[in-house]
C-alpha cells in the first residue's frame, strides 16, 4: 500500500513538472506564436483592411479634415447651448464635482440626458481615440464605423477581402454620413460599436467563448457609454435573433454544453458592460419615470391613446414615418428626391428644385414669378416625413446581393437577418403600417419611449450588407457555382433590374410628384396673398395648382427618379456580368472581388457626397467664431447683474439657442419633465400659439421668475410682477388630485397663495401663516446645483421657491439641519421655515450617482482583466 502511494505521488510530481514545463515552453513560444498569427491571411488581411479603410476615411473628408475645417452640426450646437451653463461652471471651478442640474432650459431640469458624464467614464474614454486610429475628425468616425463591421465579419469567419467590402458598404451607407453632417455624433458612435459587440457574441457561440465574451463586454461597454439608448435598444432585436439562431443550431447539433457555456460567459459580459455604465443607465432610467420618455401626464387627458402607450404619444412616435414607396430608397437613392435640406458652412440650407441637374431645360416655358415659386417654395425632396437630410441608401450592389443571399445562403442566421430586415422596414413605415406599429407600442417593452421610427432602418442597413457579403463569399467559393446558382442568380438580379427599369421608364409608379406638404405650403402662401389683397388670378398663378408649375415639378422630380433608377440598373447589370464571368471561370475570382469592391465604393461614395461635401465645412476662422452671437436683447438682459432670473423668449420658445446665454422658461429637449410639459400645454403655450393669453398665464410666468419677456415682435420687456427667487405665502390650499392642482393655478394669486397636493399636507399644513411686515427671503448664492437663501420671519411660514420641483436628489437644510421639500403650484418647491433668521440651502446631490460610479469603476477593471485573460489565452494556446 505504501509503495502504491509513493508511485502515485511520483506520478503526480512528474505530471506537475510536465505541466510547469509546458507552461514555461508556452511563455517562451509567445514571440513565435505572434509571428505565426501575423502570417495567417485573416490576420495580415485585417491590418491591410485597416489601412484601406483609413485611406478611404481620409479621402472622403479630404481636404477638410486635414485642414482643420469643421462641421457646425445643428444637433451639436443645440447640445452646446443647453450644456453651456454646466460647462462654464466647470471651467470656472476646475476640479469641482460636475453639476447634475441646469437652469438653462425649462426653468430647470437634471442633466442626465444633457451632459451625461461621470467620473468612471474616464477609465475607458481613451478607447474612442484608439478606435478612431487617431485620425482627424470626422475621418475618425468613418474609420470607427468600418473597423467595427470588419471585426464582426472576421469573427463570422468571412474571408478578409469579402469582410473589407462589407465594412465599406456598412460605413458608407448614406444614413451614417448624413448623421455626421447633422451632428448626431453619439448616435453614430453607438452604431459604430454595435457590429463588434455582435461579433463577440458570434465568436462566443462558435466555440471561442472566453475571447468572444471579452470582446462583447468591451464593445458593449463602449456602445452603452455613447448614450444613444434608442440605437442600442433597436439592436437588441438583432442580438436576440442571433441568439435564437444559435439555440436552434445547438438543438440541431445537440451541443447543449457549448451553447450554455457561451451563454453564461456572455451573460457575465452583459452584466459587466451594463455595470460599467450604471451611472448613466440607472439615472436615465430613474429620470425617465418623471420625463416625457417614460411617463404620461397625470392630468385627465381626452386622448386615451396617449396614456395607453405608457410613453410618448402615438402621433409623436410616428411623426417621422417612412413612406411605402420611399422604402425603395435602399436601392434607388433619389426615389423621393434625396434631401430637403443640406448642411452648408454651419447652417442648414433648403434644397431648391431648380438646383437639380437638367432642371433648367424643363422650365423654359415658365415666367419669372413661376420660377421664383419653384426656387423658393418647392424642395427637391417629395417623401412623406416633413423633411430629411437625405435618404437611407445601402447601395444597389448590396441590395441585389442581399436578395441573392436570401436564396443561396443556408442556416438559421440567414433567416434572422432576413426577418430583421423585413421587421425594420415595416416598423419604419410607422403610421403607414399602423397595425404593426401598434403591436410594438402596446406589447413590446420600451418601444413607445422612442420617436422617429424611420431611424429603425439602421437595422436593415446592418443586416443587408452582412447577408450580401455572405452571399458573395458563398457564390465565389462554392465549386460548380454556375451550375448550382445560375437560376437564383438570374432570378435575384432580374427582380432588382425590373424594379430599376420600372423606375426609369415609369417613375410615377412610385407615387405622385406633388405631395401634401407641397399643397400645404401652397395654401399658406395663397392665404397670405389673399390677406394682402392680391387678385385671385395672381394667387392662382403663384400656386402648386398652376398647371405649368405642377408640370415642371413633376418633370424635374420624376427626372431625378429616372436618372437614379438607370444608375442603379447599370450597377446591377455590371455586377451580374462580373459575377457570371467569375463563376464561369472567364476571369479570376480575386479580380472579380476587387472590381465589385471598387464599384461598391464608387456607388456609395458618390451618393454620400451629395449630402456631405466640401461646402458643408466651415474654415477654421469661421469655426472659431461664436456660434451664438449676442443680439441687442441679449446684451440688455446680461447687463442685469442679479444672479438668478429667467427669460421668456416667445419667438424662440422651443429653441435651444437662447439657453446658451440665459436661464430660459422654454428650451429644446426631447425628454423634458412631464409636469413641466403639462404647464406648457395648459399655460405657457398660449404665448406662442396665438391663443388668448389670460391673467393666469401671466401668473405662471411670474411664479417662474420670468423677469424678462421677449415679445413676438422681438421687443424686450421687463416684467415688474416677477416674484423673484423665493417668497412667503399667506395660505396653502390642498387639493385631491393633479387636475385640481392645475385648475387652481387659474384661480390663485401665486404671490400670496400656493396650491399643493394633499400628500404634502403633513409638511406644510400647520406652517402657513399670514406674512408679517418685515418677513423676507432672498437668494444669497447660486450655482447650477446649489442654492442658498437668507430668510427672516416673525412667526415662520411657507416659503415658495421659483425652482422646479424634482422628487429625488434635491436635499434641503435650514441652518444645517435637514428640511423636507414639498411641491406646490404643480411644479415649484416649497419649504416650511420656522420663525427667526435662518440660512436655507438646497443641493442637488443624487446619492445614486456616487453609488453607481463605484460599481462602474469595479466593472471596468473587471472587463480589462477579462481582456487581459483573453489575450493571454490566445498567446498561450497550443498550436
For the regions a protein language model found, what residue spans apply to each?
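Active-site-proximal, structured, solvent-exposed surfaces of multi-pass membrane proteins
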Residues: 400, 751-879
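Conserved luminal/periplasmic juxtamembrane motif of membrane-embedded glycan-processing enzymes
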Residues: 2-774, 778-790, 796-802
Amino acid at each position: 500500500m505504501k509503495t502504491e502511494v509513493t508511485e502515485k505521488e511520483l506520478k503526480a510530481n512528474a505530471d506537475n513538472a510536465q505541466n510547469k514545463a509546458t507552461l514555461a515552453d508556452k511563455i517562451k513560444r509567445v514571440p513565435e506564436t505572434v509571428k505565426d498569427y501575423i502570417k495567417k491571411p485573416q490576420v495580415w488581411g485585417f491590418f491591410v483592411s485597416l489601412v484601406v479603410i483609413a485611406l478611404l476615411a481620409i479621402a472622403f473628408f479630404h481636404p477638410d479634415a486635414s485642414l482643420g475645417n469643421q462641421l457646425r452640426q445643428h444637433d451639436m450646437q443645440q447640445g452646446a447651448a443647453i450644456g453651456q451653463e454646466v460647462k462654464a461652471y466647470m471651467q470656472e471651478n476646475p476640479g469641482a464635482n460636475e453639476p447634475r442640474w441646469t437652469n438653462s432650459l425649462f426653468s430647470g431640469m437634471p442633466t442626465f440626458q444633457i451632459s451625461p458624464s461621470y467620473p468612471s467614464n474616464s477609465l475607458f474614454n481613451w478607447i474612442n481615440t484608439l478606435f478612431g486610429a487617431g485620425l482627424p475628425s470626422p475621418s475618425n468616425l468613418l474609420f470607427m464605423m468600418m473597423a467595427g463591421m470588419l471585426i464582426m465579419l472576421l469573427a463570422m469567419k468571412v474571408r478578409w477581402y469579402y469582410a473589407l467590402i462589407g465594412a465599406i458598404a456598412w460605413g458608407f451607407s448614406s444614413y451614417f454620413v448624413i448623421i455626421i453632417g447633422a451632428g448626431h455624433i453619439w448616435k453614430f458612435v453607438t452604431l459604430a460599436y454595435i457590429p463588434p459587440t455582435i461579433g463577440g457574441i458570434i465568436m462566443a457561440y462558435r466555440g471561442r467563448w472566453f475571447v468572444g465574451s471579452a470582446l462583447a463586454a468591451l464593445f458593449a461597454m463602449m456602445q452603452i457609454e455613447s448614450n444613444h439608448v434608442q440605437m442600442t435598444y433597436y439592436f437588441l432585436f438583432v442580438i436576440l435573433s442571433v441568439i435564437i439562431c444559435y439555440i436552434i443550431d445547438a438543438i440541431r447539433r445537440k451541443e447543449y454544453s457549448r451553447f450554455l457555456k457561451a451563454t453564461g460567459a456572455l451573460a457575465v459580459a452583459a452584466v459587466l458592460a451594463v455595470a460599467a455604465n450604471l451611472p448613466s443607465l440607472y439615472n436615465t432610467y430613474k429620470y425617465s419615470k418623471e420625463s416625457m420618455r417614460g411617463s404620461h401626464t397625470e392630468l385627465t387627458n381626452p386622448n386615451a391613446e396617449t396614456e395607453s402607450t405608457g410613453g410618448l404619444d402615438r402621433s409623436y412616435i410616428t411623426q417621422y414615418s417612412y413612406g411605402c414607396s420611399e422604402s425603395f430608397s435602399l436601392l434607388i437613392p433619389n426615389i423621393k428626391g434625396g434631401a430637403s435640406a443640406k448642411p452648408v458652412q454651419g447652417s442648414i440650407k433648403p434644397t431648391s428644385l431648380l438646383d437639380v441637374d437638367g432642371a433648367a431645360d424643363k422650365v423654359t416655358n415658365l415666367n419669372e414669378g413661376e420660377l421664383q415659386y419653384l426656387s423658393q417654395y418647392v424642395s427637391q425632396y417629395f417623401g412623406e416625413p416633413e423633411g430629411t437630410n437625405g435618404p437611407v441608401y445601402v447601395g444597389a450592389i448590396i441590395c441585389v446581393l442581399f436578395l441573392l443571399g436570401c436564396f443561396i445562403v443556408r442556416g438559421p442566421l440567414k433567416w434572422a437577418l432576413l426577418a430583421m430586415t423585413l421587421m425594420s422596414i415595416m416598423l419604419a413605415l410607422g403610421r403607414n403600417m399602423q397595425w404593426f406599429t401598434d403591436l410594438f407600442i402596446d406589447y413590446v417593452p420600451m418601444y413607445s419611449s422612442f420617436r422617429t421610427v424611420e431611424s429603425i432602418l439602421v437595422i436593415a442597413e446592418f443586416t443587408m450588407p452582412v447577408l450580401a457579403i455572405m452571399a458573395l463569399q458563398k457564390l465565389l467559393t462554392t465549386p460548380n457555382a454556375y451550375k448550382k446558382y445560375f437560376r437564383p442568380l438570374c432570378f435575384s438580379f432580374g427582380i432588382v433590374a425590373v424594379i430599376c427599369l420600372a423606375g426609369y421608364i415609369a417613375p410615377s409608379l412610385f407615387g405622385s410628384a406633388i405631395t401634401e406638404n407641397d399643397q400645404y405650403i401652397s395654401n399658406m402662401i395663397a392665404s397670405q396673398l389673399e390677406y394682402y389683397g392680391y387678385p385671385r388670378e395672381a394667387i392662382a398663378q403663384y400656386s402648386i395648382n398652376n398647371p405649368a408649375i405642377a408640370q415642371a415639378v413633376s418633370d424635374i422630380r420624376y427626372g431625378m427618379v429616372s436618372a437614379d433608377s438607370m444608375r442603379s440598373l447599370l450597377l446591377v447589370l455590371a455586377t451580374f456580368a462580373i459575377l457570371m464571368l467569375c463563376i464561369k471561370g472567364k476571369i479570376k475570382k480575386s479580380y472579380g472581388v476587387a472590381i465589385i469592391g471598387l464599384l461598391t465604393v464608387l456607388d456609395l461614395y458618390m451618393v454620400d457626397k451629395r449630402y456631405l461635401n466640401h461646402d458643408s465645412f466651415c474654415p477654421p476662422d469661421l469655426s472659431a467664431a461664436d456660434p451664438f452671437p449676442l443680439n441687442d436683447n441679449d446684451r440688455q438682459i446680461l447687463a442685469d447683474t442679479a444672479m438668478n432670473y429667467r427669460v421668456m423668449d416667445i419667438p424662440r420658445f422651443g429653441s435651444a439657442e437662447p439657453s446658451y446665454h440665459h436661464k430660459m422658461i422654454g428650451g429644446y429637449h426631447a425628454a423634458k419633465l412631464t409636469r413641466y410639459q403639462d404647464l406648457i400645454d395648459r399655460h405657457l403655450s398660449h404665448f406662442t400659439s396665438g391663443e388668448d393669453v389670460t391673467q393666469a398665464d401671466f401668473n405662471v410666468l411670474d411664479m417662474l421668475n420670468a423677469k424678462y419677456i421677449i415679445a413676438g415682435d422681438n421687443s424686450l420687456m421687463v416684467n415688474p410682477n416677477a416674484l423673484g427667487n423665493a417668497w412667503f405665502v399667506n395660505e396653502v390650499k390642498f387639493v385631491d388630485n393633479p387636475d385640481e392642482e392645475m385648475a387652481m393655478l387659474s384661480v390663485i394669486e401665486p404671490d400670496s397663495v400656493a396650491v399643493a397636493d394633499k400628500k404634502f399636507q403633513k409638511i406644510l399644513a400647520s406652517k402657513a401663516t399670514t406674512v408679517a411686515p418685515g418677513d423676507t427671503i432672498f437668494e444669497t448664492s447660486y450655482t447650477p446645483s446649489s442654492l442658498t437663501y437668507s430668510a427672516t420671519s416673525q412667526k415662520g411660514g411657507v416659503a415658495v421657491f421659483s425652482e422646479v420641483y424634482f422628487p429625488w436628489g434635491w436635499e434641503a437644510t435650514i441652518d444645517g439641519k435637514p428640511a423636507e421639500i414639498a411641491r406646490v403650484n404643480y411644479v415649484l418647491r416649497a419649504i416650511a421655515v420656522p420663525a427667526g433668521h435662518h440660512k436655507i440651502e438646497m443641493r442637488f446631490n443624487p446619492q445614486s450617482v456616487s453609488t453607481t460610479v463605484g460599481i462602474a469603476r469595479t466593472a471596468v477593471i473587471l472587463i480589462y482583466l477579462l481582456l487581459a485573460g483573453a489575450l493571454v489565452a490566445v498567446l498561450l494556446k497550443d498550436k
